[in-house]
Amino acid sequence: MYKYETHLHTSEGSTCASSSGAEMARAHKAAGYDGIFVTDHFFNSSTTVPKDLPWEKRIDLYCKGYENALEEGRKIGLDVFFGVEWTINGADFLIYNKDKAWLKDNEHLLMEADERELFNEVRKTGGFIVHAHPFREASYIPHISLYPHDVDAVEVINTRNSDPLFGGNDCYNDRAKAYAAMYGLPETGGSDTHNTEQIVNGGILVPERINEPADYLRQIKTGSVIPLEGSFKK
């Protein structure tokens, strides 16, 4: 089996993260991971990227954490993939199989369009979407928002749901599992890691190596993904 982290943040792109992309790559390699997906918060959430720059420059800065992790990963033998954590009304969605060029070409879609228009376009053009921690409760989340017909999978285990910041309540994961089962949505998992101290054996196991994000989607669709419980470090 192969182990991957599907949900992590870097200090280059997310204000809530405190470890760089390169540091994250080294730490995950040391922890026995075969690869990671860098999913920094986009501009509608906790981004480090200034608002007053040209769009293309903003995207360049946004991708720095991933690019630094990728460079380090190539040196140490860790596969590194790109993702985006996109937010609407406090609900977070992990977008995969899109790249920097696509982000640069879709400012309107990412910043102004209705969320279902974005989701539809992402999926229609080869990307896929995982609803991250759908039942998390926090001060910045005004209400629970579910999109069962617009996503490809549900993050049924988010290791960081055990963080006291969110009430330290594992029931959020239990509710996510029930939701996925109710709608017949595939399950996946992620640690939602923000620094190297939070690498807690979360993420996923899959039977086949992921060489590109499409390999992850294929294994999601076949039900081959095993979400890992992990254990949040307080």
Predicted stretch roles:
Residues M1-I88, H149, E197:
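An N-terminally biased module of ancient metal coordination in phosphate/nucleic-acid-related enzymes
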Residues K3, K29, L70-R74, R116-V130, ...:
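Surface-exposed amphipathic alpha-helices with a cationic face
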Residues H41, E85, A132-F135, S191-T193:
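Short, well-ordered beta-to-alpha junction loops that form the rim of enzyme active sites
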Residues T15-S19, P50, N106-H108, L165-G168:
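Short, solvent-exposed loop/turn segments at secondary-structure boundaries
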Residues M1-T6, T10, S20-R26, N89-L103, ...:
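Charged catalytic cores and adjacent phosphate/nucleic-acid-binding surfaces used
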Residues M111-N120, F166, D170-D174:
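Active-site-adjacent beta->alpha loops and helix N-cap segments on the catalytic face
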Residues W86-I88, L110-A113, P134-A138:
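Short beta->alpha connector loops
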